[in-house]
């Protein structure tokens, strides 16, 4: 199977999971990125079962609306049973690196209020140690250089994310992103807490304190379901 085929496979598997485990009339939390898009496309077939969705980005909102799925502001929702999103990397504990699509802050906010985080990914995203994929940090623009120095002191290589024309990439929240290369993150929870404590950091793309509860992993042999303790 190609990577795109695996993404569609797990997108459908996530829709099936929602149908089986989330009651009709609920609101679904939806992530951002190419794999999350496959879930949205599969969810569209059963959209009449659910009130709608909470979106983690402008791009996801547009895709949901294009399928006729109602989008709620998180402030309108009292509870969220499930959040479905992809990952750039996921380890054996369910900790993830996320934010390759630039939506890490809103993804983390929506994930934090969901009862269950379902990660959907192809098998290449499963790693023994996080860090081969550059770690995104969303930063207030004026703190960019100071945070870069802190990252360098920890052994990382900070790279400002830019657009095709070389301008800084701007998030939906009006901030910038530093992508940190060269890390081996052996203590994801501790590293997440450390970076989040730096002034000027909006959030880091480590999802360890609130990791995945379940991963639907696309493999050449089908979908592997991994349940994480705790």
From Swiss-Prot:
It catalyses: aldehydo-D-ribose 5-phosphate = D-ribulose 5-phosphate. One of its GO terms (molecular function) is ribose-5-phosphate isomerase activity. The active site is at residue 107. InterPro entries: NagB/RpiA_transferase-like, Ribose5P_isomerase_typA_subgr, Ribose5P_isomerase_type_A. One of its GO terms (cellular component) is cytosol. Pathway: Carbohydrate degradation; pentose phosphate pathway; D-ribose 5-phosphate from D-ribulose 5-phosphate (non-oxidative stage): step 1/1. Gene3D superfamilies: 3.30.70.260, 3.40.50.1360. GO terms for biological process: D-ribose metabolic process; pentose-phosphate shunt, non-oxidative branch. It holds the Pfam family Rib_5-P_isom_A. SUPFAM superfamilies: D-ribose-5-phosphate isomerase (RpiA), lid domain, NagB/RpiA/CoA transferase-like. Substrate binds at residues 32-35, 85-88, 98-101, 125. It is an enzyme of class 5 (isomerase). HAMAP family: Rib_5P_isom_A. Belongs to the ribose 5-phosphate isomerase family. Catalyzes the reversible conversion of ribose-5-phosphate to ribulose 5-phosphate. NCBIfam families: PRK00702.1, rpiA. Homodimer. This is Ribose-5-phosphate isomerase A. It comes from Burkholderia ambifaria (strain MC40-6).
């Amino acid at each position: 199977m190609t990577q795109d085929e695996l993404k569609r496979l797990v997108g459908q598997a996530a829709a099936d999971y929602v149908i089986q485990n989330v009651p009709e009339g609920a609101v679904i939390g939806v992530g951002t990125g190419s794999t999350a898009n496959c879930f949205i496309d599969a969810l569209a077939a059963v959209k009449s079962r659910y009130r709608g969705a909470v979106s983690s980005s402008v791009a996801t909102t547009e895709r949901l609306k294009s399928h006729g799925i109602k989008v709620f502001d998180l402030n309108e929702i009292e509870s969220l049973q499930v959040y479905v999103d992809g990952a750039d990397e996921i380890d054996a504990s369910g900790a993830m690196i996320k934010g390759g699509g630039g939506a890490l802050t809103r993804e983390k906010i929506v994930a934090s209020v969901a009862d269950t985080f379902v990660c959907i990914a192809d098998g290449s995203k499963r790693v023994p140690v996080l860090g081969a994929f550059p770690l995104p940090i969303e930063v207030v623009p004026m703190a960019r250089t100071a945070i870069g120095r802190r990252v360098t002191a920890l052994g990382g290589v900070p790279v400002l994310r830019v657009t095709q024309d070389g301008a800084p990439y701007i998030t939906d929240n009006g901030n910038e992103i530093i992508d940190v290369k060269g890390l081996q993150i052996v203590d994801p929870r501790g590293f997440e807490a450390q970076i989040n404590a730096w002034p000027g950091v909006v959030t880091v793309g480590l999802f360890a304190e609130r990791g995945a509860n379940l991963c639907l992993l696309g493999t050449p042999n089908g979908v592997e379901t991994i349940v994480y303790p705790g």
